[in-house]
């Protein structure tokens, strides 16, 4: 067995593999972003810039069902970036629909879940 470090710019607690063809490794930890490693790309390239991704948590506050331009505070017609308290916790990919679920606010902030 071989262990390899992968550079990331986000917390890497509680890893959970997804159910996709890329064998994506989803991570949770402190910080206001969802982070992942596309292990298929990592295995092929050993390039963290190509294999690692992240995105901030965003609420669909304008209610149109899609990701739009977003800001840090609610604003007419835009979605809103969300900081889940002490950070996301316990990431869990859904086995059939591809959504990614997190719990939030475990130690501080608003309790809830993110999808």
Each model region followed by its residue ranges:
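Acidic/polar residues at beta-strand termini and the immediately following turn/coil
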Residues: 1, 18-19, 37-38, 43, ...
């Amino acid at each position: 067995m071989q262990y390899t470090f992968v550079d990331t710019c986000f917390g890497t607690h509680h890893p959970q593999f997804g159910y996709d063809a890329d064998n994506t490794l989803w991570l949770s930890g402190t910080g206001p972003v969802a982070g992942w490693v596309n292990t298929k790309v990592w295995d092929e390239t050993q390039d963290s810039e190509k294999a690692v991704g992240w995105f901030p948590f965003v609420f669909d506050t304008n209610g149109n069902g899609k990701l739009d331009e977003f800001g840090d505070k609610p604003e007419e017609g835009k979605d809103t970036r969300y900081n889940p308290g002490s950070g996301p916790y316990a990431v869990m990919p859904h086995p059939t629909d591809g959504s990614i679920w997190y719990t939030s606010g475990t130690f501080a902030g608003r309790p809830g879940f993110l999808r």
